[in-house]
Amino acid sequence: MDRYCVFGNPIGHSKSPLIHRLFAEQTGQVLTYEARLAPLDDFIGDARAFFAEGLGANVTVPFKEEAFRLADELSERARRAGAVNTLKKLEGGRLLGDNTDGAGLTRDLQDNAGFALTGKRILVLGAGGAVRGVLEPFLAQKPAVLVIANRTVAKAEQLVREFADLGPLVAAGFDWLDAPVDLIVNGTSASLGGELPPIAPSLIQPGHTLCYDMMYGKEPTAFNRWAFDQGAARCLDGLGMLVEQAAEAFELWRGVRPNTAPVLAELRRQLAG
């Protein structure tokens, strides 16, 4: 049977096996998909062992940069991201590395939330790997401007230098900004600790600005609770991004696009339970 997996460490919390099982059932694809705890000091060895038989894998924290180095070929979006979250075995055993994170977020915003990015003023908080992965897909939608705000401004400036050829990018500190924007994406991990990036409430235009946290949980994240209190039009979490990036990977492997809506609904139901 065709084998797939997700590599991570830790990995017990992963929803990927459930997501891909539901995708496979829905599309009539016959495959297995497992969560695989890779050793912190030998991801590449474990990945090579899996790909002796396996056909594809997702890669999560902390192995995305190592997967980038493992890949024999890279998609343009993976090359830009400097990280790989999806591997596919090609003819002859070569590995293609892709990054579906940014495409997943873009699709969640545009298809599921009905929010077009074209012509919008976008603020992205953070300058780490999660943000790097979304810049190419976001800029492909031709926003009016995309501002990267970070505590260490030099990191944001580095991303601007790397991606400036793709569209209008600006670097800023968290406290440099006060004019309202159309979309704020929290790409920091602050919500994991119940904390907030130190940004001005005036960035949110009540009833207009959409706020999106890449993190998700049973309860609204700290960032989304704050955004709601400031009058944000909508506050979305990263569960839709998780399901949509998985669908991108599934389509890359199997050549068929699953319907994400029932899968996202099932995950929401389980999360609430």
Curated annotation (Swiss-Prot):
EC number: 1.1.1.25
Binding site for shikimate: S14, K15, S16, T60, N85, D101, Y216
GO molecular function, one term: NADP binding
CDD domains with a match to the protein in the record: NAD_bind_Shikimate_DH (cd01065)
Superkingdom per UniProt: Bacteria
UniProt entry tagged with the keyword Oxidoreductase: yes
Listed InterPro entries: Aminoacid_DH-like_N_sf, NAD(P)-bd_dom_sf, SDH_C, Shikimate_DH, Shikimate_DH-bd_N, Shikimate_DH_fam, Shikm_DH/Glu-tRNA_Rdtase
Name of the top EC class for this enzyme: oxidoreductase
Assembly and interaction partners: Homodimer.
HAMAP family linked to this entry: Shikimate_DH_AroE
Protein name (Swiss-Prot/TrEMBL): Shikimate dehydrogenase (NADP(+))
Organism: Ectopseudomonas mendocina (strain ymp) (Pseudomonas mendocina)
Record lineage: Bacteria, Pseudomonadati, Pseudomonadota, Gammaproteobacteria, Pseudomonadales
Gene: aroE
